[in-house]
Amino acid sequence: MRKNLIKEVSKFYNKSGWIIKNNISTDANLFEDLRKNSKHYIRLCRLRINKHIPKKGTNILDFASGPIQYKEYLSYSKNFAFRHCVDFSKDAIELAKKKLKSKGKYYHKNFFRIKFEKNFFDCSISLHTIYHIHKYDQKKAIIKLLNITKINSPVIVVYSNPNTLINKFKSIINYKNKKEQKIYFFCHPIKWWQQFENIADIKLYPWRSFSSQHQKIIFPNNIIGKFLFKIVFYCEEKFSNFFINNFQYYFIVLKKKKLS
């Protein structure tokens, strides 16, 4: 099943995921809220991790980089000499090359098969990727990211919470989503991250409160929706623990400890 899963994800992104129509990818059309009212909020959410990325460094790893499709994503490597992009999709790598040019290092390979040096990267990022890896291999991915990133340097992972208030409400009313899942998706509960506490310092932060699907339902595409997004962003910053534990997306910053 695990090999089939890799083929499934690879097939989607090599066949259609990064096809661009009207400057928008299939991936963005499927998984992002592209409406005008949400634009500023989503931009601020994407920029959140810049607070945790080192101000300078030589090498930053982008695991499952895609084509670096948003301007905010491009900003993550602005203070580094090289951005190392790993992705299953040849199209994604080719598009990333056009943006990074000689500043990029490119790997059209399976992440688990690439032999990176230990303690090589000054920072590693993985956005919306780990939960598309088989649930029994996600730990392996985090361990590898920690191994190849320097001691006390950040490994930043954007992940999803399976126990949101919306999901709890759905379970109460016995709601079942009949929409076919495009690619594999499995999220461990937040406490899953505690297993890494013996090898890394771990901190959690809110990323975005709602999936794009729910945003489109809850927030109207007008000035009222835009105002509501401002309130949500303020509350995420003010009451971070509540939003991490009860809403959709959060990110984890892991810093490998120096073990004696």
Q: In which residue ranges do the predicted regions lie?
A:
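A C-terminal cap/extension of S-adenosyl-L-methionine-dependent methyltransferases
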Residues: N174, P206-S260
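Conserved class I S-adenosyl-L-methionine
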Residues: M1-I53, G57-G66, I156-K178
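A conserved beta-strand element that flanks and buttresses the S-adenosyl-L-methionine
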Residues: I125
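A short, conserved alpha-helix within the catalytic core of class I
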Residues: I133-K144
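Short alpha-helix
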Residues: I183-A200
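Class I SAM-dependent methyltransferase SAM/SAH-binding core
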Residues: G66-R113
